From Swiss-Prot:
Subunit text: Heptamer of 7 subunits arranged in a ring. Interacts with the chaperonin GroEL.
One Pfam short name: Cpn10
Cell compartment(s), UniProt: Cytoplasm
Gene this protein is translated from: groES
Entry-linked PROSITE patterns: CHAPERONINS_CPN10 (PS00681)
Domain of life, per lineage: Bacteria
Protein species of origin: Parasynechococcus marenigrum (strain WH8102)
Protein name: Co-chaperonin GroES
GO molecular function: ATP binding; metal ion binding; protein folding chaperone; protein-folding chaperone binding; unfolded protein binding
Amino acid sequence: MAAVSLSVSTVKPLGDRVFIKVSESEEKTAGGILLPDTAKEKPQVGEVVQVGPGKRNDDGSRQAPEVGVGDKVLYSKYAGTDIKLGGDEFVLLTEKDILAIVN
């Protein structure tokens, strides 16, 4: 079996899935206290880096995704599959788990 080299450009989500680069979590509190890694909360904001072709409707047509590459999004806390690539954190989730586009 050949080894597969994964990178952001080689991951192509299927259906209505979205590949998101997770934003960095806060290093310190508003009061200036540094947080250890174990105390950091999982961020729920990230940037869309890849989008699938969309959900397939009952008639076979595709429903275009509402989000696009480059959108900053807020997503459900426990949604998706966490993936690490090249030291960065990503999450692969379905479009329905995206709560909002953040401007």
